[in-house]
Amino acid sequence: MGVAVTLGEGGTPLLPGPRLAEGLGCELWLKWEGANPTGSFKDRGMTVAVSRALEQGAPGIVCASTGNTAASAAAYAARAGLPAVIVLPAGAVARGKLAQAIAAGAELREVGGSFEEAHRIARRLAEDEGWVNVNSINPDRIEGQASAAGEIVEQLGKLPDVVALPYGGGGNTCAYVRGFEQAGAGRPRLLAVQAAERVSTFASAIRIVEPVHRERAEAAAEVVTVGEEELAEWWRAIARLEGLFCEPASAAGVAGVARVRPAGTVVCVLTGHGLKDPDAVSSHLASQDG
């Protein structure tokens, strides 16, 4: 690829989680993707997708989003000097992520209905206008996000026994499969952890009813379902025991490990920063104190 649109993404820390691991019966590591430039793992894929769009002379980029993709797409489009249109399901996007997209100058279009409806509209816009769709249906997104798996192997010095990550649309699960294949060290047991209340979960990043990559993701990973109380409990524990302030959806991996209790070396992927979703943070802390 001749053109590189980058904000310095990747190379995120892999941190031991000994206090979280107490009682779980495993050696626990935390892949801290909140350290990426816009605060989530989406940056890994967006650098590749937007670089490709710029190289191909695309007039702009478009995507549907519940938040993290919007923030990342807007930032990388601004870096590339390309316009961006973000299609959002009305009322479903966390305030922190919305602020990032607005600050970067993206055009926001709110639509009624679910993420799935926003996704259909974004695909139609891309087809009608000739813009590049940078949702995870774009293979460049998956290719970029695959880099995290190789980093884990390099940072650990070996293949972990288990990798657990949040399961929303399924694109990141597919990316990890691809990344471990590229690393050539084999594939660990993958836990794709979803919210039981997919429609209404407070973890907005995985509030997706119809995963776009369901078939591929569920063929490669073991799907684990956790409840709202489990998500909230482990989200608070990650901050209080290990000092990492992640967004609620990021706690899904740890919650899934707590439910399944795998042995060996376990890596949980914390996909985004807690500042992404201040309303969820405030409401849950307030309800706990109350």
Where are these regions (language model features)?
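PLP-dependent amino-acid enzyme catalytic core
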Residues: M1-G290
